[in-house]
Curated annotation (Swiss-Prot):
EC number: 7.1.1.9
Principal location class: mitochondrion
Native species: Meriones shawi
Name of protein: Cytochrome c oxidase subunit 2
Subunit structure: Component of the cytochrome c oxidase (complex IV, CIV), a multisubunit enzyme composed of 14 subunits. The complex is composed of a catalytic core of 3 subunits MT-CO1, MT-CO2 and MT-CO3, encoded in the mitochondrial DNA, and 11 supernumerary subunits COX4I, COX5A, COX5B, COX6A, COX6B, COX6C, COX7A, COX7B, COX7C, COX8 and NDUFA4, which are encoded in the nuclear genome.
Bilayer-crossing regions: 15-45, 60-87
Enzyme class at the top of the EC tree: translocase
Catalytic activity reported: 4 Fe(II)-[cytochrome c] + O2 + 8 H(+)(in) = 4 Fe(III)-[cytochrome c] + 2 H2O + 4 H(+)(out)
Binding site for Cu cation A2: 196, 198, 200, 204
Keyword vocabulary terms for this entry: Copper, Electron transport, Magnesium, Membrane, Metal-binding, Mitochondrion, Mitochondrion inner membrane, Respiratory chain, Translocase, Transmembrane, Transmembrane helix, Transport
Keyword Oxidoreductase listed: no
Subcellular location: Mitochondrion inner membrane
Chain ranges on the Mitochondrial intermembrane side, renumbered to this chain: 1-14, 88-228
Length: 228
């Protein structure tokens, strides 16, 4: 959940987001070390009075600054490829939800159930209840079981959209005529907020996403009540 004046990432609520947070810290540490080294070398160059007027080349130095960046790139690429594979791989999902983007709302269809589909519009400010969040609440939340792999099929009916929930590490483009997929898994129950993350027109800022993750038993009761 985001909060005012937040400078860091949202708390990770899924295995993928935990991996992304660790990768962010790993990459940031490498960038910090490189920046410190470069600043140190620049300060030496500005303060030293020693010069080499007779040096034409330095094969050893050139070898080092060719091999060292290659090693650094490998250290960044290997965990990145691992996370990309984790985000793309979906093994035996217990549920499939089809998400369609529209100007300017989302529609959801639970493909494993008959007639379980609905549209999700932003709740206007004058209809908000005490404690609800402005520009983030919707009239129909997406209810899903926690701690289980769920496949989201994402597309669009009109223009480009992007279905994003930061605390779950989700951001998938909704492209007309193309079906993208993403894995949704939550480590704990809760309500998770997101928004359309692709500029899609004048009301782009009014396309919130709300996921409510609950235990499986409660989800079964909810699905029965929605299909009756």
């Amino acid at each position: 959940m985001a909060y005012p004046l937040q400078l860091g990432l949202q708390d990770a609520s899924s295995p993928i987001m935990e991996e992304l947070t660790n990768f962010h810290d790993h990459t940031l540490m490498i960038v910090f070390l490189i920046s410190s080294l470069v600043l140190y070398l620049i300060s030496l160059m500005l303060t030293t009075k020693l010069i080499h007027t007779s040096t034409m080349d330095a094969q050893e130095v050139e070898t080092i600054w060719t091999i060292l960046p290659a090693i650094i790139l490998i250290l960044i690429a290997l965990p990145s490829l691992r996370i990309l594979y984790m985000m793309d791989e979906i093994n035996n999902p217990v549920l499939t939800v089809k998400t369609m983007g529209h100007q300017w709302y989302w529609s959801y269809e639970y493909t494993d159930y008959e007639d379980l589909c609905f549209d999700s519009y932003m709740t206007p400010t004058n209809e908000l209840k005490p404690g609800e969040l402005r520009l983030l609440e919707v009239d129909n939340r997406v209810v899903l079981p926690m701690e289980l792999p769920i496949r989201m099929l994402i597309s669009s009916e009109d223009v480009l959209h992007s279905w994003a929930v930061p605390s779950l590490g989700l951001k998938t483009d909704a492209i007309p005529g193309r079906l993208n997929q993403a894995t949704v898994t939550s480590n704990r129950p809760g309500v998770f907020y997101g928004q359309c993350s692709e500029i899609c027109g004048s009301n782009h800022s009014f396309m919130p996403i709300v996921l409510e993750m609950i235990p499986l038993k409660l989800f079964e009761n909810w699905s029965v009540s929605m299909t009756q």
